[in-house]
Amino acid sequence: MNAVGAHTIRASTVLPARRRDIELHTADGLRLVGELALPLERDPVATLITLHPLPTHGGYMDSHVFRKASYRLPALADIAVLRFNTRGTTSDRGTSEGGYDAARDERFDVAAAIEFAEFAQAPALVNRWLLGWSFGTDLALMYGNDPAVEGAILLSPPLKFSGPEHLQGWAASGRSVVALVPELDDYLRPDEAVKRFSAIPQARVIGVEGAKHLWVGEPYLRRVLDEIVATVRPGFGPLPTTWHGDVASASVIAPAKKTAL
């Protein structure tokens, strides 16, 4: 822990929070491992239920955007961050039971995460939003259209596993959908994303100039976090780039060499 003072927030900066290991239990009998990061001294005003990129291409609960969200958002914006490994996925936290099922049985994983957040107490996890990245956006669109969530924030959505029927379901629900689409994405770029997401009248597509699928680089990471906060806590932000108080430092995990679909 570094001494109290003004610290520039960097990729490795870990701000104060209450962090605890959690387990999710799926309807088909699996145990999934995860972590919940909460504001240190206050109850959260919003909750992010994160759905990570494709585990066969390096995605897991520690994928860098989600890891840094858990490092920063509880302290900077009073937002709780729930991260977990989908079935068969491994991180430092451990390995979730089961095996990757190409967005089929992962429906049970999404349901277990939503249920955990919905019924959490001390503190209650209010104002719940899904935050998917790549493969995780497909899981959000396919299985996250649930009355217990306010909406979905989609990072680099490829629209690979999800289909028109899932977009239609979100359209009918009226729940918020916000898609952050990198200008230089490998799978779906902003102009095409606008066309595809027009099936959801309430959806907002935000193109991010210069960004790529993996959101590598502090400027792009900050843009993502600012857009998340603006969505789940309107009128709050942009996030500060310095912190006055104690901080810790974590090892920096390089993004996966494979494209994290």
Which residues does each predicted region cover?
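N-terminal cap/lid segment of alpha/beta-hydrolase-fold proteins
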Residues: 2-42, 46
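Catalytic histidine-centered segment of alpha/beta-hydrolase-like enzymes
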Residues: 211-223
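Alpha/beta-hydrolase active-site loop
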Residues: 99-120
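Short beta-strand/loop motif that positions the catalytic acidic residue
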Residues: 173-174, 178-181, 185
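Gly/Ala-rich beta-loop-alpha elbow adjacent to hydrolase catalytic centers
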Residues: 131-140
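Short, surface-exposed "cap/lid" segments of acyl-processing enzymes
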Residues: 40-83
